[in-house]
Amino acid sequence: MHRSLAGSAVLMLLLLFALGNFVGVQPGLVTRDADNGQLMDNRRNLRLERKTMSLFKSLDKRADCSTYCFGMGICQSGCYCGPGHACMPNGR
């Protein structure tokens, strides 16, 4: 492999790790059951805990919540129906 290709590959890997969304295996989360010797996964449901990461604010965080819901609970994404039937931004 040429030096320029190797440098590009290393740079791409560094960017992948720096900007990626990784869930690692932490020690102590996978254990062996004392009764039957089976491996057990002690991690909580990762799908529920996963938070998306982005370099830029997503559109729903910039949503304009200046509309009224009239008690029907219908607001834009990123908003909720608050007091006075006004859509309010979620506390993110």
From Swiss-Prot:
- Annotated signal sequence is 1-20
Keyword Repeat recorded: no
Annotated S-S bridges: C65-C79, C69-C81, C75-C87
Q: Where in the cell is it found?
A: Secreted
Cite the GO molecular-function annotations of the record: ion channel regulator activity; toxin activity
Q: Domain of life of the organism in this record?
A: Eukaryota
Q: Which UniProt keywords apply?
A: Amidation, Disulfide bond, Ion channel impairing toxin, Neurotoxin, Secreted, Signal, Toxin
Tissue specificity remark: Expressed by the venom duct.
Would you name any one GO CC term? extracellular region
Main site of residence? secreted
Q: Which residues carry this modification: Asparagine amide?
A: N90
Keyword Disulfide bond assigned to the entry: answer is: yes
Propeptide feature: residues: 21-62
Similarity annotation: Belongs to the conotoxin P superfamily.
Domain notes from UniProt? The cysteine framework is IX (C-C-C-C-C-C).
State the function annotated in the UniProt record. Answer: Probable neurotoxin that inhibits ion channels.
**What is the protein's given name?**
Conotoxin Im9.4
Query: Which organism is this protein's natural source?
Result: Conus imperialis
Q: Highest lineage ranks of the organism?
A: Eukaryota, Metazoa, Spiralia, Lophotrochozoa, Mollusca
